[in-house]
Amino acid sequence: MTRAAAGIVYAVVFILCLVLGIVPTAIFVSVMSGLCCYEFFRMTRLDGKMANERMGIAAAVVFPLSALGDSMLLNALLFALMLAVGIWYVWSPRTRISDVAVTLMGPIYTGFMLSAIVLLRDAVPGFAGALLSVGVCASLWVSDSFAYIVGSRIGKHKMVPKISPKKSWEGFAGGILGSVLIWLILWATHFYKLSLPYALLCGVVVSILGVIGDLIESRIKRGVGVKDSGNLIPGHGGMLDRSDSLIFGCITAQLLLMIGGVL
C-alpha cells in the first residue's frame, strides 16, 4: 500500500467514526491511544526505561472510553492511574523514579490527551457535532499537508534542524494558512457561536500547538535514535507518527472553544 493510499484509508476510517457518533469515535480513539502508548513505551525501552507497560497501555485504552458522557470519569481515571502507579512504585524496590515518570507519561501523553476528540464529538449533538470534530482534526491534517508542500517548495529557514531537519519557518507559515482555511469553513457554516476573529485565532493557535506536538514526538524519536515510532501505517510510520499533532492540537481546540463559549 502506498503512502497516499494508507493516509486516505486512515483518514476515511477516522472521519467515518466521527460521523457515526460518539460511541464509534470513542472506540476508534481508544484503539488509537493504545497503539500510540505501546509505541511510546517501545521507544522508551530503547532508552533503558522499564515502565509498567500493561498498566500504562490499559489506562491509555480506557481514558477515551471514560470520556463517554461524563468528563468526571476521565478525572477519576487519572486519579486511579496516579494511585496505581504509586502503589506499584512502593512495592517494587527495583523500580526507578524514571520508570514511574515514563509509566505516567505514556497514557497521559496519549490516551488522556486524545480523549479531547471524544469530548469534542460529544459536546455538540447531531451533524453539527460531527462537522466540528471532523473540522478540528482536518485543520491539523491540512496544516501538516500545507506545511509539507510549502516547506518542500520554498522552505529555506529551518526551525529546529537538530530535532526535525525538514521543518522550516516557511512551511510553518503555510501550515497555519491551511488550518485557518478549515476554521473559516467552520465559521461560514454558522452552526456555531464562532465569530470571524475567534475562528482566525483558533486556526492559528491550533496549528501552532499541532506543530509543538509534532516536535515533541520528534524529540522523543531523536533521543532514542529511531526514525519512526513504528511501522503500522505504510509510508507514515507508526500510529503515534500520525497522531502527534492531534495530541496537543485537539485538546487546544477544545479549550479554546470552551473559553470562547462555543461549547
Language-model features and meaning:
Residues S179-V180, R242, G249, M258:
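Hydrophobic transmembrane alpha-helices of multi-pass small-molecule transporters
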Residues A6, R42, A147, E217-I220, ...:
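Hydrophobic side chains within alpha-helical segments
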Residues G223-L246:
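Interfacial loop-to-transmembrane junctions
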Residues S143, A173, L240-F248:
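Membrane-embedded alpha-helical segments of transport systems
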Residues M1-V204:
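Membrane-embedded alpha-helical bundles of polytopic integral membrane proteins
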Residues L255-L263:
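Juxtamembrane boundary at the C-terminal end of a transmembrane helix
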